[in-house]
């Protein structure tokens, strides 16, 4: 082997090693999908509530891998996103949202996964909502597949989790207690 061939082969091996070992992605919801009033109607709640992020630390968690690609999620960011969307949707339905209310709820993303099928990418997100005093809690699932992109499956899964929370009679009963 000549000196030039060794140099090209070594360079190619180093290049391919870096190419295939550094393919990490962070999955984040891009923006809220508004919940229409015909999906979840107005709510008759006469007291103020507060929602807070139940994930204290910001750290990346591996949620999927495919070949050399790895996808991570920061559950603190996802929980903050869902809290923000829930506050907006509840305000739009007549619920008073005030910080540090006695009626406080924690929202916590517990698990997220990305799954590839033949024609679509699926995102499943599990969100726990609990009263701050510990008297009530429930886990909700947002499950969405999109043939278009991974980002759309993430956005749809978060939307479906928010809709599941807003439509749940147990959540309404926990607010009205």
Please report, for each region that a protein language model flagged, where it lies by residue.
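Generic low-polarity alpha-helical segments
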Residues: 1, 50-52, 127, 134
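Sec-dependent bacterial lipoprotein signal peptides
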Residues: 1-23
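Generic marker of residues within folded, mature protein domains
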Residues: 6, 13, 39-41, 97-99, ...
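A structural "domain/chain start" motif
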Residues: 23-84, 172-177
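Surface-exposed short loop/turn segments
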Residues: 24-34, 83, 88, 92-149
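Short, Lys/Arg-enriched charge-dense amphipathic segments
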Residues: 54-56, 118-131, 159-167
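Short secondary-structure boundary motifs at beta->alpha junctions and helix caps
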Residues: 64-76, 132-176
């Amino acid at each position: 082997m000549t000196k030039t061939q060794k140099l090209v082969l070594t360079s190619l091996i180093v290049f391919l090693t870096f190419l295939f070992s550094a393919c990490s992605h962070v999955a984040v919801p891009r923006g809220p999908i508004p919940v229409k009033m015909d999906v979840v109607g107005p709510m008759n709640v006469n007291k103020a509530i507060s929602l807070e992020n139940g994930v204290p630390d910001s750290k990346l968690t591996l949620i999927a891998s495919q070949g050399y690609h790895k996808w991570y999620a920061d559950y603190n960011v996802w929980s903050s996103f869902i809290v923000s969307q829930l506050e907006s949707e509840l305000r739009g339905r007549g619920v008073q949202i005030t910080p540090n209310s006695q009626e406080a709820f924690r929202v916590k993303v517990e698990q997220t996964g990305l799954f590839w099928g033949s024609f679509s990418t699926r995102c499943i997100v599990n969100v726990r909502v609990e009263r701050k005093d510990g008297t009530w809690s429930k886990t909700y699932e947002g499950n969405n597949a999109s043939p278009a992109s991974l980002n759309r499956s993430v956005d749809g899964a978060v939307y479906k989790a928010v809709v599941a929370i807003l439509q749940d009679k147990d959540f309404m009963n926990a607010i009205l207690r």
